[in-house]
Amino acid sequence: MKIDKIKAIRTLYFAYGMNTNHDEMSKRCPDSIFLGSAKIVNHKLTFQGVADYTEDKGSILLGALWLISSNDERSLDRLEGYPNLYDKSFMEVSFGDRHMNAMLYQMVKRNNFSIPTSYYEHCLRKGYKQSNIKI
C-alpha cells in the first residue's frame, strides 16, 4: 500500500446500501479501502426506493466497513444529497470482536416503504456478496 494513500485516509464509513458494491465504490471513492463486513445492533435495513435504516430493537443492520479519505467523503456527500436527502452521523459498529464509531448516511425525510428498482436490487445483492455480507 502506498504511503500517500494511507495519509489520505481519515474516516471509517459504514455502507449498508449501494456503497456495499465494490465496483460502485471504486468509481465513487477511489481512495477507499474495504475492511470487511460489519454490523449495527438494534437497527434494520428498510427501503424508500433506495436503502435506508431505522431503529428496531433486536434487529441487526449489516453492511460494509470502509476507510475513506476526505475527498471520498466529499464525493459521497454529493452523491447522497447531503444534507437535504441524506444526513450523516456516527454510530457504534461491530467489526469482528471490535466496536468502533463509523460514519453513515440516513434519509432525512421518512416516507413509507417502497420497493427498489431491479437494477438497484441487483447492485445491492452484488455488493453484499462482494462484501461477504450474509443475507
Protein language model features and the residues they cover:
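Glycine-aromatic micro-motifs
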Residues: 2-135
